[in-house]
Design a protein with these regions (language model features):
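Residue-level recognition of alpha-helical structural elements
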Residues: 91-94, 118-121, 138-146, 158, ...
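Short, cationic motifs built from Arg/Lys/His that form the positively charged side of catalytic pockets
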Residues: 27, 42, 46, 102, ...
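Short linear motifs at protein or domain termini
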Residues: 1-104, 111
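Hydrophobic side-chain positions on well-ordered alpha-helices
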Residues: 16, 135, 154-156, 201
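Secondary-structure edge/capping motif, primarily at the C-terminal ends of alpha-helices
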Residues: 112-113, 132-139, 202
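C-terminal all-alpha effector/ligand-binding and dimerization domain
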Residues: 126-133, 148-150, 160-163, 167-229
């Protein structure tokens, strides 16, 4: 996808804010300085400010300019913000907070999937599961298949509001999976069995078993995460 100039500046400043170049409470450079630095117009910079405000990374103060917002006000459900934070630094507090969201959301998603999944949905989940099995010693390919698996489960719920959370949930899952992948004989068979158990529960339309399978999967992921942090 080709980015326009506004988008490119948003990404640059957003990443600089998240990385700590501009700390919360400090001011961004003046509008005129940003225009000069990025070789662009005031209208473009004002569009950038509006975008960063929507992500709650900055606050505009009358006659004073743009200031970095406190971290606890940042919009972590904005997929750009979440991805920038996860790319920039491993923050155990953020991972822990988002893992709590997984515990809240994913068991319900699993139950609804068991109640609503179509034959086409089941084929998508099974395809991703088979790719996980086939690539269980290839970290990158395995994690991509794992993400596809969970996305397919979410898609099978057929809830348009939940779909809006899909990218944020996937970003979190990707960050967790990349840090908790363990291809050894002590862990990989258990991981694959947990994913198969969830698929089987969904396939058999067993909501209770699907919910329990999701809880078991999250507990295993959380345990592995704690072991490496």
């Amino acid at each position: 996808m080709t980015l326009n100039k506004t988008d490119r500046i948003v990404i640059t400043l957003g990443k600089q804010i998240v990385s700590g170049k501009y700390v919360p409470g400090s001011a961004l450079p003046a509008e005129a300085d940003l225009c000069e630095g990025f070789e662009t117009s005031r209208n473009i910079i004002r569009e950038v400010f509006r975008s960063l405000m929507a992500k709650r990374l900055i606050e505009m103060k009358r006659y004073r300019g743009a200031f970095i917002a406190p971290r606890n006000q940042w919009n972590y459900l904005d997929t750009d913000v979440l991805q920038w934070v996860l790319e920039n630094d491993y923050d155990p507090r953020l991972i822990s907070a988002m893992s709590e969201i997984r515990n809240l959301v994913e068991p319900a998603i699993a139950r609804w999937a068991a109640e609503r999944a179509t034959s086409s949905d089941l084929a998508e989940i099974e395809s991703a599961l088979n790719d996980m099995i086939a690539n269980n010693q290839d970290r990158e390919a395995f994690n991509e298949a794992d993400i596809r698996y969970h996305e397919a489960v979410l898609q099978s719920v057929h809830n348009p509001v939940l779909q809006q959370l899909n990218v944020a949930i996937s970003s979190l899952q990707r960050a967790v999976f990349e840090r908790t992948w363990m291809g050894d004989a002590a862990n990989m068979p258990k991981t694959l069995q947990e994913h198969k158990a969830l698929f089987d529960a969904i396939r058999h339309q067993d909501g209770d078993a699907a919910e329990q399978a999701a809880l078991t999967m999250i507990a295993s992921s959380t345990r592995r995460l704690k072991e490496i942090t």
